[in-house]
């Protein structure tokens, strides 16, 4: 029987719930216990932003995958969310798929040892 190895207890659902309360987060977040959702998205780091368009027939298409904005720890650029906000605005205005999507930059996803996706190895 496989026993999940806890390598980052601070990322547990209980601790994330506490962090959300302390930080005043009002947005939903997903606990991906088996990391299948992250693998399906080919996620690599956090934070990583995905915006889907609802096609109205039960299908959702990936419209934006990228950074929140140009801010990074230590670069003194204030958080603005401009890249994600621009993508949301474009999607709401039925504009075409944004061609300039900057990849996210952050901490690698902590994959379960032995269960890392092929692109991570």
Each language-model region and where it sits:
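Structural microenvironment flanking redox-active thiols in thiol-disulfide oxidoreductases
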Residues: 3-22, 36-38
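Structural recognition of the beta-strand scaffold that forms the well-ordered cores
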Residues: 3-4, 28-30
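Thiol/selenol-based redox catalytic cores and closely related redox-interacting motifs
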Residues: 26, 32-116
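Glycine-rich phosphate/pyrophosphate-binding loop
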Residues: 118-121
């Amino acid at each position: 029987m496989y026993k999940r190895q806890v390598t980052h207890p601070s990322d547990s659902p209980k601790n994330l719930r506490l962090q959300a309360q302390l930080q005043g987060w009002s947005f939903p977040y997903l606990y991906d216990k088996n990391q299948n959702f992250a693998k399906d998205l080919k996620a690599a780091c956090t934070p990583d932003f995905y915006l889907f368009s609802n096609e109205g027939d039960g299908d959702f298409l990936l419209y934006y995958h990228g950074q929140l904005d140009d801010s990074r720890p230590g670069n003194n650029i204030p958080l603005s969310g401009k890249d994600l906000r621009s993508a949301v605005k474009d999607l709401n205005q039925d504009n075409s798929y944004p061609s300039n999507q900057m990849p996210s930059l952050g901490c690698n996803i902590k994959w379960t040892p032995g269960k890392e996706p092929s692109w991570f190895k």
